[in-house]
Swiss-Prot record:
Identified in the spliceosome A complex; remains associated with the spliceosome throughout the splicing process. Component of the spliceosome B complex. Identified in the spliceosome C complex. Identified in the spliceosome E complex. Component of the U11/U12 snRNPs that are part of the U12-type spliceosome. Component of splicing factor SF3B complex which is composed of at least eight subunits. SF3B associates with the splicing factor SF3A and a 12S RNA unit to form the U2 small nuclear ribonucleoproteins complex (U2 snRNP). It is found in: Nucleus. GO terms for cellular component: nucleus; spliceosomal complex; U2 snRNP; U2-type precatalytic spliceosome. This is Probable splicing factor 3B subunit 3. Pfam families: Beta-prop_RSE1_1st, Beta-prop_RSE1_2nd, CPSF_A. Keywords: mRNA processing, mRNA splicing, Nucleus, Spliceosome. The keyword DNA-binding does not apply. Transmembrane segments: none annotated. It comes from the Eukaryota. Residues 674-696 have a biased composition (Low complexity). Residues 671-696 are annotated as: Disordered. The gene is sf3b3. Involved in pre-mRNA splicing as a component of the splicing factor SF3B complex, a constituent of the spliceosome. SF3B complex is required for 'A' complex assembly formed by the stable binding of U2 snRNP to the branchpoint sequence (BPS) in pre-mRNA. Sequence independent binding of SF3A/SF3B complex upstream of the branch site is essential, it may anchor U2 snRNP to the pre-mRNA. May also be involved in the assembly of the 'E' complex. Also belongs to the minor U12-dependent spliceosome, which is involved in the splicing of rare class of nuclear pre-mRNA intron. It comes from Dictyostelium discoideum (Social amoeba). Its main location: nucleus.
Length: 1256
């Protein structure tokens, strides 16, 4: 078995974000660290985010930080990864890629505690940076320029300190003095010696004990630029809970030094400066016995002002400012700012935005409505209690509608699936194409997300029409690219026998003064020349000038016009009988007839190419009769309407043609452009001339062909010779394909209308074709208005629809259904198709907990706050308004209930309406961990079984009781009725239906239960499994069981003996997270370290187990070292780079092959595609081997070592690496493709086909 790995959905979790001017312009950009990839984000003035570049690094990115050289104009990126190397990246805006500027090796590969890469700190002036490990090692590199002004890096300078654990690191702003770096660390030398010198467990032992015994230190490391060495300049003790150190602007911009964040306090520290301490305010309802801890931070600096924005573990944002004079700080001011969802990282941008990379859920870009200066300075002090704690009432906590944000306003979101807890591919709403159902998030951010392949759209307006239109067009106010007003003025809708003209403004109204003939069917409306309009109808055409003067041309004789096409200077019409007449605009902006040509066959389609840059006329026209072929004709005067190339369609009827220019960064176009500009020519292949010709037109010309059978063909049209090459085919639907040109992100795009609506557009330099989540359309046109600069107007039956496309670049659009608590599992009712979700929350506030007993001090302060508000506002004590203001916070901000406190729900949901039919809450303290439906015996009635635990404590693990709850579906499956509970000894994490009974994993035992009158009856059991059972699959008489620590076990059930026998297991111990049966002998599994593997039972063993004539073979077989008597064969292995949470065997294409679909905790969705031919295996294996040597990973990690992180990669080809082929320069593409005996275009075509035909 050979598999091909492809990523469908990129990782959506963001572990770190940085901002800077990476492209060298003044535009602020954001770089996101997704753990295994980097992404560059830009946003417009409206705060809408757009992904500019996404790149896999084929390694684990541990940290990133930006820096700018002194007097530089652009920012660079320093990356710390698992490669044992430090890498400096530069964003190349011309090629839209990250270029590796420097790569320095300093240690071993892997995420090790003593290998630097976990922490990065940069001197604020860009002169040096420090890279540090969790323990011991710290290296300093000096940054400089060479004689050519290129960035250079020095040899590393060591700043190691043994037996030291680092918690945080930053650069200290000292102006242009010797660079200084600050760290928060703790020395565990005494702890290490007291434990006997054991190096392996010293950190863990120290963390488990009271850290107060060991003093945390703030240490300054100075880089002496003269002596070229690093010394520890200063060290002082800080709070034991200190966890973050932040740089304070220095020199002429501030006092310098650092801020240290610890539990309950923000402290200003600097050498030769007294400590200045400020208490962090607390929210109402928080536990007074637990301090406030800062988890993320950012800062903003501008001329004459700077401030810090930090976030607590509750989601509260605090603004920190300093009162200082010179280099002396007198006070640290910490004021409540706003409350948002918990963020892994905060990034304050220079132009008034805040990016919050959420820990779980969507990431948000906020606009600063204000920076909190108008907050009363004495507000916090006025709420100070006798212990010195400061209290405040939070706003908009975690997305609840308590009170709107005061200082921030969300402007844009990046969708995130992280973490994916459970995942299934189903077609519950009968849409033909399956939907992807995902349980995501935790706590208040929990949701069920329904993913559909395609881009989401926003419908702006919909209106009914008097009939079914035959076409729709828009007319701009001005065709000049320099025009101030680029909006459209008319929407023209054609019906049978009539035409309607609509004016575009604040409202859309009918217009009768446009000069357009309204008493006929319109075939084409197009802007031409100096704001003129051409209208083509069956009997002729009208040329309407900007001053409404009309020139009309009539078709000769009894002939009628059947097809027409035009650009801004040319018009071609096709008459009945097969005659083509070609017109051009003269210098007086009048249309003059140039030539006629009779093709002697009825014309089905005609299309004129766009006008290239630097020319006045287009050079080619494409025409076709109904059965093809498609002919490309020249429009040059010396060979006007002469054939230059041809495309065969195998006599399939043609529906539409379109020629469009797109800026495609593929097949080494940039290299060929540079060669063309220097006069070099290359004629190796047809694709070479195609790439070089794009220089003339500013982009690549593509001919799209829509066929009657629902297939679209795409060919590259050479803008010099007119030759067609690189032909690609895609099935879009069941109906004929109509093609319409639109604008997306200011660039040309193509809308293909079939049984689904598809969009062809350029995404990060590549041509993507994705469906739109909208009803089938029949006609479409681009529309620009004051309300929406880029929208589309279309018709569907007798309706007109105006819509815009959201979130370009996404592969799936999402529909979110909010949940009450953290989801655990969901299943589908086999008869009603209802979705059954099990939600379980630990440390949860249950309704019977008395808040006054838990947090009397917080409640007292609430009442005091209420009295103060009443006195200030002159409101009586019995006024209900003030009570309404305070009461919701008492309910929302109750303290955590503590360990062993759980709340669980069983929710039944309609998959079509998303209505919650039942939300059954389990008893207080009862936690549900597993769920399945089961039909006992031959009755056919479906029951629901839930594995529950009461008062469970996770660490150390303990529980009061465990049981199986059996529920009956009532009211047509919409409600649940509890029948009884069955006590078990250990928690049940996995269960399944098995031959009319229930099989479940009770601790490390496998049990089979049957239904009884008062409880489930134990029928069979085996205790021969090592630890805890987390997965169970049944097929025939076999059970495939996943152990939490010991991989996969095959179990045989002997019905005659009513016995279970473990007869095969894995050789390697694996910490299982998910598994799926591929066939009777094969299983795919995943572990928590990111490995996906395939195991197979040897055929000989499988036959022996099934054909045991004595019936006693399994009974007397025994393995060695407590293992099974037989071992599974290791078929395939692959390291994904992230913890895999689910595996599914499914088909994503109707009638397509089955694939293994996997999801990760970071929100990524990937697929393993089985190969069906040896030829494909050889092709992709050779391609992968060449890509490993010619496309080195961005962060210096060896690709083969990365994919073999824990086990050697076997029989799985990395499709993500193979798809990097299109980013290589042309010479590398050519050398690799020659080894494959193909051209570069054929290699890219092969890569596209395996994704489109077998996945989406």
């Amino acid at each position: 078995m050979y598999l091909y790995n492809l990523t469908l959905q990129r990782p959506t979790s963001v572990y770190q974000s940085i901002s800077g001017n990476f492209s060298g312009t003044k535009q602020v950009e954001i770089v996101l660290n997704h753990g295994r990839s980097l992404e560059l984000i830009r946003y417009d003035e409206n705060g809408k985010m757009q992904s500019v570049l996404y790149t896999e690094v084929f390694g684990i990115v541990r940290s990133i930080i930006p820096f700018r050289l002194t007097s530089g104009t652009k920012d660079y990126i320093i990356v710390g990864s698992d490669s044992g190397r430090v890498v400096i990246l530069e964003y190349n805006s011309q090629k839209n890629q990250f270029d590796k500027i420097h790569q320095e090796t300093f240690g071993r590969s892997g995420c090790r505690r003593i290998v630097p890469g976990q922490y990065l700190a940069v001197d604020p002036k860009g002169r040096a940076f420090m890279i540090g490990a969790i323990e011991k090692q710290k290296l300093v590199y000096i940054l400089n320029r060479d004689s050519s002004a290129n960035l250079t890096i020095s040899s590393p300078l060591e700043a190691h300190k043994s037996n030291t654990i680092v918690f945080s690191m930053c650069g200290v702003d000292v102006g242009f003095d010797n660079p200084i770096f600050a760290t928060i660390s703790v020395d565990y030398t005494e702890e290490d010696s007291s434990s006997g010198g054991g190096g392996g467990g010293s950190i863990e032992e120290m963390m488990d004990e009271d850290i107060g015994k060991k003093k945390k230190l703030l240490t300054y490391y100075e880089l002496d630029l003269g002596l070229n060495n690093v010394v520890r300049k200063w060290s002082d003790q800080v709070d034991d809970s200190a966890n973050i150190v932040m740089t304070v602007p220095g020199g002429t911009e501030g006092p310098g030094g650092v801020l240290v964040a610890s539990e309950d306090y923000i402290v200003y520290r600097n050498q030769d400066h007294a400590e200045v301490r400020s208490r962090i305010p607390r929210r109402y309802g928080s536990d007074p016995n637990k301090g406030v801890l800062i988890i993320s931070h950012s800062s903003h600096k501008q001329k004459g002002m700077f401030f810090f924005l930090v976030q607590s573990e509750h989601g509260d944002l605090y603004k920190i400012t300093l009162d200082y004079q010179g280099d002396q700080v007198s006070e640290v001011n910490v004021n409540y700012f706003d409350t948002i969802v918990l963020a892994n990282c905060l990034t304050v941008l220079k132009n008034g935005f805040l990016f919050a990379a959420s820990e779980f859920g969507d990431h948000t870009l906020y606009f600063f409505k204000s920076i909190g200066d108008e907050e009363e300075e004495g507000q916090a002090k006025r709420l100070e209690d006798k212990d010195g704690h400061l209290w405040f009432t939070p706003r908009n906590s975690c997305g609840t509608k308590m009170e709107e944000l005061k200082n921030l306003e969300p402007t844009s979101h990046l969708s995130s699936l992280s973490p994916i807890i459970d995942f299934k591919v189903l077609d519950l709403v009968r849409e033909e194409n399956p939907q992807l159902y995902s349980l995501c998030g935790t706590g208040l951010n929990s949701s069920l997300k329904v993913l559909r392949h395609g881009l989401s759209v926003t419908t702006i307006t919909t209106a009914n029409l008097p009939g079914v239109p035959s076409g729709i067009w828009t007319v701009p106010k001005s065709t000049s690219p320099n025009a101030i007003d680029q909006t459209d003025k008319y929407i023209v809708v054609s019906f049978v026998g009539t035409t309607s003209v609509l004016s575009v403004g604040d409202t859309i109204q009918e217009n009768h003064e446009s000069g357009i003939l309204e008493t006929t069917t319109t075939l084409l409306v197009k802007s031409m020349g100096d704001d003129a309009i051409i209208q083509v109808f069956p009997t002729g055409f009208r040329h309407i000038k900007s001053d409404l003067r009309i020139n009309e041309w009539r078709a000769p004789g009894r002939k009628t016009i059947v097809r027409a096409s035009a650009n801004q200077s040319q018009l071609a019409i096709a008459l009945s009988g097969g005659e083509i007449i070609y017109f051009e605009l003269d210098q007086a902006s009048n249309l003059i007839e140039i030539i006629k040509k009779d093709l002697r066959r009825d014309i089905a389609c005609i299309e004129i190419s766009p006008i290239p840059k630097g020319r006045n006329m287009a050079r080619f026209i494409a025409v076709s009769d109904w059965e093809g072929p498609i002919r490309v004709l020249s429009l040059d005067r010396d060979n006007c309407l002469g054939q230059v190339s041809m495309l065969d369609t195998d006599k399939v009827y043609i529906e539409s043609l379109s020629i469009i220019e797109m800026q495609l960064n593929e097949m080494g176009i940039e290299t060929k452009k540079s060669q063309s500009q220097t006069g070099q020519t290359t004629t190796t292949t047809t694709s070479t001339s195609s790439a070089s010709s794009s220089v003339t037109s500013g982009g690549s010309l593509f001919l799209f062909v829509g066929l009657k059978n629902g297939v679209v063909k795409r060919a590259t049209l050479d803008s010099v010779t007119g030759e067609l090459s690189d032909i690609r085919t895609r099935l879009l639907g069941r109906k004929p394909v109509k093609l319409f040109k639109v604008k997306v992100r200011g660039s040309n795009a193509m809308l293909a209308l079939s049984s689904r609506v598809w969009l062809n557009y350029i995404n990060q330099g590549k041509l993507d074709i994705v469906p739109l989540s909208i009803e089938p359309l029949e006609n479409a046109s681009n529309l620009s208005s004051e309300q929406s600069a880029e929208s589309i107007v279309a018709t569907s039956e007798n309706k007109i629809i105006i819509f815009s496309i959201d979130k370009l670049g996404d592969l799936f659009n999402q529909e979110t259904i909010k949940l009450n608590a953290t989801p655990k599992r969901f299943i589908i009712h086999p008869q009603t198709s209802y979705i059954i979700i099990l939600e379980t929350e630990t440390n949860y506030n249950t309704d019977n907990i008395d808040i006054d007993k838990i947090n009397e001090q917080s409640e007292k302060l609430l009442l005091e706050k209420q009295k103060e508000l009443q006195q200030e506002m002159d409101i009586d004590d019995d006024d209900q308004n003030n009570n309404n203001e305070i009461e919701p916070f008492k309910k929302l901000f109750k303290p955590k209930a503590g360990k062993g406190k759980w709340k669980s729900y069983i929710k039944i949901m309609d998959p079509i309406t998303h209505e919650s039919l039942e939300s059954l809450m389990l008893e207080d303290g009862e936690a549900g961990f597993s769920v399945c439906t089961c039909s006992f015996g031959e009755s056919g009635e479906i029951f629901l079984v839930v594995g529950c635990v009461t008062d469970m404590v996770l660490n150390p693990k303990s529980h009061k009781s465990a049981h199986l709850n059996l529920y009956r579906f009532i009211d047509g499956g919409k409600k649940l009725e509890l029948l009884y509970k069955t006590e078990v000894e250990e928690p049940v994490y996995a269960m399944a239906q098995f031959q009319g009974k229930l099989v479940c994993g009770v601790g490390k035992s496998i049990r089979i239960y049957d239904m009884g009158k008062k409880k489930l009856l134990r029928k069979c059991e085996t205790k021969n499994l090592p630890n805890t059972i987390v997965n169970i699959h049944s097929l025939g008489d076999r059970l495939v069981v996943g152990d939490i620590q010991e991989s996969i076990h095959f179990i045989k059930y002997k019905r005659s003996e009513n016995m279970l026998y473990v007869f095969a297991d894995d050789l390697a111990p694996r910490w299982m997270t998910s598994s799926v049966m591929l066939d009777y002998d094969t299983v795919a599994g995943a572990d928590k370290f990111g490995n996906i593997f395939v195991l197979r039972l040897p055929l000989l063993i499988s036959d022996e187990v099934e054909e045991d004539p004595t019936g006693t073979k399994l009974k007397f077989e025994s393995g060695t070292l407590n293992g099974a008597p037989h071992k599974l064969d290791h078929i395939a292995n692959f390291f994904v780079g992230d913890t895999v949470t689910t595996l599914n065997k499914t088909s994503l294409v109707v009638g397509g092959p089955e694939v293994i679909l996997y999801t990760t905790i970071s929100g990524a969705i990937g697929a393993l595609i089985p190969f069906t031919s040896r030829e494909d295996v050889d092709f992709f294996s050779t391609l992968e081997m060449n890509m490993r040597s010619d496309c080195l990973p961005l962060c210096g990690r060896d690709h083969l070592a990365y994919r073999s992180y824990y086990f050697p990669v076997k029989n799985i080809i990395d499709g993500d690496l193979c798809e990097q082929f299109s980013t290589l320069n042309y010479q590398k593409q050519l050398s690799i493709s020659e080894e494959l005996s193909r051209s570069p275009s054929e290699v890219i075509k092969k890569l596209e086909e395996i994704r489109s035909q077998k996945l989406l």
